[in-house]
Amino acid sequence: MGTSTATISTAAWADDHTPRIAILGAGPTGLGAGYRLKELGYKNFQLFDRHEYVGGLAHSFTDAQGFTWDIGGHVMFSHYSYYDRVFDALMGEEYTLNNRESWVRMFDRWVPYPFQNNIRYLPKEAAFECMSGLIKAQNGKGKIASPTLARNFGEFIDAVFGEGIAKHFMRPYNYKVWAYEPEAMNKQWIGERVAVLDVDRALKNVMLGTDDFGWGPNNQFKFPLRGGTGEFYRRFGPALGLGKSGGECHVNLRKRVVSIDLERKVLSFSDGTAEHYDILISTMPLDVLCNSVLRGDVPAGVKSAAAGLKHSSGYMVGIGLRSRAPGAGTPDTKSWMYFPESNCPFYRVTYLSNYSPHMTPDRANYYSLLCETSESPAKPTRGDNGRDTEAMIEETIVGLENAGLLEPGERKNIVSRWCYYADYSYPTPSVERDEILTQVIPFLESHDIYSRGRFGMWKYEVSNTDHTLMQGVECVNRLLLGEPETTIGMTYQITQDGREAAVHERSAQAGSGEKRLSKPAAAQTPVPQTRAANLGVTADGVEVQVPGVARVVVRPRAAGAVLAA
C-alpha cells in the first residue's frame, strides 16, 4: 500500500481564492495533512492545536531529571513508502535501528512473544490445557465451531485459540489492554495486531522445543536518536513554517476550539478568536466533535450514534532509575513486555532506555521503564480518571516489584517518577462501531468535515502513527487529486481457520473518492468511479442513510468550481 507522491509544479494551488482548509489537531494526522498540502503547493490552509507543542499523542517529554518519555510504547515501523520518505527527509540518519525483543510475564517466568507460539515455556499442566484447547478449536470442537461464526472478539478468541490460551493469556491480557471484555469488541480489527495460530507450528514448537520469536511487522524498528518518538513529529513544525511570520506559518498552537458553526463554517476558539473555513479536516475525538463542539442542525441520530463510541483512558507511568551497578546501564536487552496477570496494574512495560542511548541522563548509569495501564467505566483504577496520578505511580512501582522488574531494595534507586494521563488513549473497536461510523462520517462529509485520525476515524486497526499520518496525507490526496483513501478502507477477511489478510477496499464509511476540491481544468485528474460497498450510488452523488435525516447525497463538485470564500 502507499500513496502517490506526484506534486503539482505549477501555481495551481497558490491562488488566494482557493478554498480555505482548516486542520484541527497537530498530531500525526494533522501534520501529515499539512505536510502534503504544502508539498502539493497548496497555500490556503491553517493547522490549529490546543497544546503548546505539536505531535499530539506522539509527543515526547523530557523531565527535570533528564529522562525522555513517550506517551505509550511507540515504535516506528512503516507500511508505506511515502511515510518512509518523509521520515528520511526529516530525520536523515538521526535514528537508531533496533531489533524487537518482546516477552510475556506469567507463571513467574518469561515467555517469548507471541505467547501462543511459545507454549512450551509454560508449566506442563498449563501447556497441556493450551495445546488441547487449541487442537479442539482448530478441529471445530471448541466453544465456537468456526471463527466465521464468531459474533465478537471474545468468541473469535474461543474459536481460534481454544479454552486454554483464552484462559491463560488472551482474555486476561486483552481486558487489561482495552479495559473492556472481549465480548464488547468486534473481530474485524484484529489483522496484524494479534498473531493467530498455525496449529502444526505450535505443536512443532512444543514437541521439538523450538522458539518462535519472529511474528509481526515490527521485528525491527527505527527510533529517533534524540528526543523520543516526538522528535520526528516536532520537525514537522518548522517544515510547516512554525516560528515564521505572515503567510509562511501554517501552524497555530494554544488554539482550543470550543465550537464549530456548521452552516457558517466558522471555528470559534477559547481565546475569543474565530476562523472561517471551507473544508475542515478534524482529528478531535468523534464523539466530542458531534456532541460538544458542533453547532447547527446536527440530527439527534448522529449525536446518539457518536455518543455510543467506546474508548479507554490510559496512564503512562515512567520510572527512571540508577543502574544496579556503576556503568551497568539497562539491566536487560528486552524491548517491551506484556503482563496478563493481576499482580500488576499495567499491561505493557517498555525499556525505553534500550531504544536510544539518549533517553536517560547517562546511558551507562541510568535506565528507564515506561508502564501503561488502561482505565474505563468497565475497568476503574486507583487513578480515578486522572485525579490521583500519585496513587497510580505507587501501584505501578509495587507492580514492578511483583513482576520482578524491580529487584528487592531497588526502589531506593528510583530518581524519576513521571506520569501522563490520556483521557483518550485507545479507540475501542466495539461491536457497534462500524455501524456508528456508517451513520456519522457521511453526515460530516456532507458538511465538508473530514474526520480522520486515531479518534477522528476511531479505527484502532489503522491507528499506528504511520497509519494516522497517512490518513491525513490520503485525505488531502482525495480532496486535491481525487485519489481514494486506502488506509481507512482497510478491512480484514477472516477465513475458516481464523487467519486473516489485509484487504484495501473503498470504505463504506468514507474515502469513496467521490468528493474533492476542483482544480483548474488544465490540471484536472479524473475521479475514480468505484461503487462504495454499502452506500447507494446515484447519478448526482453518493446517497447515505443517516438517522434523523431523510436523505443525504454527497455530491462531486463541478469541474473548475471552487468554494466561495
PLM feature segments, named:
Residues 13, 19-47:
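N-terminal Rossmann-like FAD-binding beta1-loop-alpha1 element of flavoenzymes
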Residues 277-279, 283-450, 457-461, 467-470, ...:
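C-terminal segments that line or cap access tunnels to active or ligand-binding sites in enzymes
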Residues 29, 53, 287:
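Conserved Rossmann-like nucleotide-cofactor binding loop
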Residues 38-62:
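Glycine-rich FAD pyrophosphate-binding loop
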Residues 65-145:
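Dinucleotide-binding Rossmann-like beta1-alpha1 core, especially the glycine-rich loop
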Residues 7, 11, 430-565:
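C-terminal lid/capping helical subdomain adjacent to the catalytic/cofactor pocket in oxidative enzymes
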Residues 119-120, 126-127, 131-263, 276, ...:
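Active-site/ligand-binding neighborhood in enzyme catalytic cores
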Residues 2-17:
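A short, basic/flexible loop-to-alpha-helix module at the beginning of a structural domain
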